[in-house]
């Protein structure tokens, strides 16, 4: 179960970086 939470955590971090990247491009 810990592995699943680790993957979800990495996905959230990835999405946050993508959002910040888009906001900075404005």
UniProtKB/Swiss-Prot annotation:
Localisation per UniProt entry: Membrane
Membrane topology: Single-pass membrane protein
Keyword Transmembrane part of the UniProt annotation: yes
GO CC aspect terms: membrane
Transmembrane stretches, start-end: 3-23
Alphabetically ordered keywords of this record: Membrane, Transmembrane, Transmembrane helix
Name the record gives this protein: Uncharacterized protein HP_0560
Lineage: Bacteria, Pseudomonadati, Campylobacterota, Epsilonproteobacteria, Campylobacterales
């Amino acid at each position: 179960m810990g592995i699943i939470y680790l993957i979800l955590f990495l996905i959230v971090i990835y999405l946050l970086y993508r959002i910040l990247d888009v906001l900075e491009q404005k």
